[in-house]
Amino acid sequence: MIYQSPTIQVELLEDNIAKLCFNAPGSVNKFDRETLASLDAALDSIKQQSNIQALVLTSGKDTFIVGADITEFLGLFAQDDAVLLSWVEQANAVFNKLEDLPFPTASAIKGFALGGGCETILATDFRIADTTAKIGLPETKLGIIPGFGGTVRLPRVIGADNALEWITTGNEQRAEDALKVGAVDAVVAPEALEVAAIQMLKDAVAEKLDWQARRQRKLSPLTLPKLEAMMSFTTAKGMVFSVAGKHYPAPMAAVNVVEQAATKGRSDALQIEHQAFIKLAKTDVAKALIGIFLNDQFVKGKAKKAGKLAKAVNSAAVLGAGIMGGGIAYQSASKGTPIVMKDIAQPALDLGLNEAAKLLSAQVARGRSTPEKMAKVLNNITPALEYAPVKHADVVVEAVVEHPKVKAQVLAEVEQYVSEDAIIASNTSTISISLLAKSMKKPERFCGMHFFNPVHKMPLVEVIRGEHSSEETIASVVAYASKMGKTPIVVNDCPGFFVNRVLFPYFAGFNGLLAEGGDFAAIDKVMEKQFGWPMGPAYLLDVVGLDTGHHAQAVMAEGFPDRMGKSGNDAIDVMFENKRLGQKNGKGFYAYSVDSRGKPKKDVDPTSYELLKAAFGEQKAFDADEIIARTMIPMIIETVRCLEEGIVASPAEADMGLVYGLGFPPFRGGVFRYLDTMGVANFVALADKYAHLGGLYQVTDAMRALAANNGSYYQA
């Protein structure tokens, strides 16, 4: 053994080829500080051996290296620029040491080689992947750029255009796609991986392969004619801006770094990367996106723990077909859990099956599935007009019309047919779970399971704990949601649960602006372009449906009359009463037609303005700051109330609920990250300016105390 540490082992194989194996404790290899220090020491030990002729890098895990240890980032990035620069330079010195070894090097890649893992393989002369390998530089998804030489080496290995696409999108690349562009030199079967890598090194030692020329290319400026370079970088900037926009600076910074470094050798090029990396690491966007990554890991970790308490879910049922039931059935069946789809009407069953078939056909058309897989998934969905097939289900999801009496009746009925230990969940967006439980004989085996529409696209599921829901029930539904490929958060029962409870104060702020003559299209523009929502409030209400919004608003007003009760009609009432229901009937705040691709197309409709003018008088202009304040303050305060009341367990879960359930702008990180970035004291001062507008704008005592102590919701 040449070198051994808890994360890396180096041994000498036959023919004086050394093997460096990444094999950290735990399930995966990460590039944390310990591994980086071990790699540095291992390379020093290797350099001291006079007989080594080549080096192969391998992994003792099912995957190569998944990337840096992102849990270290927020603390590290809070350091002074000088400290951060020192860390980046020290890390890069290790990668340079690997690249500069006086003999050929190769990486044997299996599973993920992402971020720092990808930058490791780029520092070697040869890269051999097995068929399971996925390679990529996902750093821009965290608001930063590669910091261990990725922006320097990748363009010199696969060309500027390919490298810019890889880096700016942050997408993982399959082994065969990496081979096409030259990121890897060969793709082999998993069992042949190490042998193939060693053979390539033997050929290099025997001078059958010119490893020195390959290495020199990475150390030199990019070989790109001036005109071609100008066209390449100009095109990349245009494409990046159209996708990333102004709120996500990292992809554009990556293009600029590759462009500026194109004429430089390795040393100067790396300095350009270092400076851009440090600048981005200090941004609020990086803090927000890294926070989302960590919160996602936290939420998924909680779901994994819940799985230990969960009852196994081998079969399921959904009551109520149609679009929602069909979506739930598709999601369950496509992830491997057979499901019965029960309805009282054959046309509804047909609609549900057609919905599932449509989603599957789209996957086949995109090459993401095959007709055989599609048939298998459809065979996992059993349509039924009677309850009999439901009796074997481990979990039954009720998804009938959003009406308390109808739901209560269906829940009481199905309970008579299911097994003693079956779990029943209601897919409701607003109705109290504890109220619905009153119709059931076993309320402890009942909870809420709120899917978001469209089911196949929206990652969040709210699992609602009723007054009597048992821990096994909650754990089992959380585990089932995870098995369906969803991100579950557990919330306690209250009107609107968590997501809708915090959404409707936002709509109330919007209604308040319209009541004073605000222009809904102008408000949408500010909330989309400046704040960063995927849809402004008017457009979102049209998509949700003004009838749905009208009903949910009434539920919220009844549940929280002091804050959400209202006197007189608001804009939602005006649209609803004039049968303007949104996209579903072609007219809401906007008018809708169908474009050439069959998608809804929105247009300004003068009728909407006439109706609002008749109700609220002449239009009045509001500036962007006021629009943002008056819509967002109510949502933020209500989110804080949910945390204080224990409706949601942590800032992390609240923020993930907002990002995954509502599309809260990821670059802002969620309400609690946004509050911490803004400063709680600054927010309280802003809210106080609008406190005269009512309870939705009045901060809680706990918020005021936190502000006075200069506190924050996250501990950095």
From Swiss-Prot:
Task: Tell me the segments the record calls region 3-hydroxyacyl-CoA dehydrogenase.
Answer: 311-716
- What protein is this chain from? Fatty acid oxidation complex subunit alpha
Entries under HAMAP family matching the protein = FadB (MF_01621)
Q: What gene is behind this protein?
A: fadB
GO BP terms, alphabetized: fatty acid beta-oxidation
Q: Reply yes or no: does the keyword Metal-binding apply.
A: no
Q: Where does substrate bind?
A: 296, 500, 660
Q: How does it assemble?
A: Heterotetramer of two alpha chains (FadB) and two beta chains (FadA).
- The organism encoding this protein is Shewanella oneidensis (strain ATCC 700550 / JCM 31522 / CIP 106686 / LMG 19005 / NCIMB 14063 / MR-1)
